[in-house]
Every structure is written in C-alpha cells, then in structure tokens.
Amino acid sequence: MSHHVYELPIDVSQIQTLLPHRYPFLLVDRILELDLETKWIVAQKNVSINEPFFQGHFPNRPVMPGVLIIEALAQVGGVMTQLGLGRDALSQLFYMVKVDKARFNKQVVPGDVLIMEVQMKRLIRNVGCFYGEAKVDGEVVASAEVMCAGAR
C-alpha cells in the first residue's frame, strides 16, 4: 500500500508512481484538482507536435486521435482510483473494459492544452465507472463514460 502524500498540482513524476503507463502512452501531465470525497479530479495534457501519433494522424494536418483522448480520460480516472484506494502503480493493473456515449465535438491539435474533468460514478470491488469531459479553452472537445476493471 502506498503512503505517499501528494500536494497539488501533482506532477508527471508523481503520476508515474500511480499509473503503469510510460512514454509514449502516458497521456496525463499534471493533476490540477482532486477531491476524493466527491470523487472529482481535473488533469492536464499538453498536446505537442512531438507526439508520435501525429506522424501518421494525419501528415500535414495533425489531429489527436479521439480514442487517445478517451484513453487519457481513463488514465485520469485511474489516478483517482489509485489515490482513493491508497495504492500505487504496481498494486493492481486496471484495464478499460467498456466505453459508452463517446462524443467527439472538436479536433485537438498540437499546441492545445487538454483539460480533463473526471467524475467517478461508482467503484465496486475492482470495477470503476467514470464520466469524463476533455476541454480545450473551456470548450468540450470529447466526452465519454468509461468502465475500468482490475486484473484478476
């Protein structure tokens, strides 16, 4: 069990103690807000032209793949789950098992700062359900309900 004390903002090196993901698949740069009582978390992803997915999505017109925005929301939910359970990245792996009501409203491009707001709806045993919105400049660019389950 982890006994770390985290002060906001939580930086990427601390996030790496909570999530098993690493470059190029760690999609959370900073935790800005966290309320474990209301199960609410806000995180940031700085979208850089140096992201490896921009090489092929799309050449000369880079757009962040929507599925990676959903993955980023799930990772933010994972941070909250680990903090809420007092665990670290190695305690138990969680996998995305379901996505519902995914919506993509606007393209995310290099230079954007993605702000992800995630609300945990429930956590029963090893299954967490979240609703998340990703925003750029205050405008919702993507949203989804995500379910993650711990590995057995």
From Swiss-Prot:
A biological process term (GO) from this entry: lipid A biosynthetic process
Annotated active site: 57
Alphabetically ordered keywords of this record: Cytoplasm, Lipid A biosynthesis, Lipid biosynthesis, Lipid metabolism, Lyase
Any one Gene Ontology molecular-function term assigned to this protein's record: (3R)-hydroxyacyl-[acyl-carrier-protein] dehydratase activity
The reaction(s) this protein catalyses: a (3R)-hydroxyacyl-[ACP] = a (2E)-enoyl-[ACP] + H2O
Annotated InterPro entries: FabA_FabZ (IPR013114), FabZ (IPR010084), HotDog_dom_sf (IPR029069)
Localization per Swiss-Prot or TrEMBL: Cytoplasm
EC id: 4.2.1.59
Highest rank taxon of the organism: Bacteria
Pfam families, sorted: FabA
Record's GO cellular component terms: cytoplasm; membrane
Family: Belongs to the thioester dehydratase family. FabZ subfamily.
Role according to the record: Involved in unsaturated fatty acids biosynthesis. Catalyzes the dehydration of short chain beta-hydroxyacyl-ACPs and long chain saturated and unsaturated beta-hydroxyacyl-ACPs.
HAMAP family associated with the record: FabZ
Stated name of the protein: 3-hydroxyacyl-[acyl-carrier-protein] dehydratase FabZ
Organism whose genome encodes this protein: Xanthomonas euvesicatoria pv. vesicatoria (strain 85-10) (Xanthomonas campestris pv. vesicatoria)
Taxon lineage: Bacteria, Pseudomonadati, Pseudomonadota, Gammaproteobacteria, Lysobacterales
Gene: fabZ
